[in-house]
């Protein structure tokens, strides 16, 4: 459904932000 789609999309964004922060810290 639409909710599942947005949940997956949100997780992708969160993962990108987390990986981006790790690169900034390094």
Swiss-Prot record:
GO terms for biological process: killing of cells of another organism. GO terms for molecular function: toxin activity. Keywords: Antimicrobial, Cytolysis, Secreted, Toxin. It comes from the Eukaryota. Expressed by the venom gland. Its main location: secreted. One of its GO terms (cellular component) is extracellular region. It is found in: Secreted. May have cytolytic and antimicrobial activity. This is Oxyopinin-3b.
């Amino acid at each position: 459904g639409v909710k599942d789609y947005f949940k997956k999309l949100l997780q992708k964004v969160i993962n990108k932000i987390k990986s981006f922060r790790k690169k900034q810290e390094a």
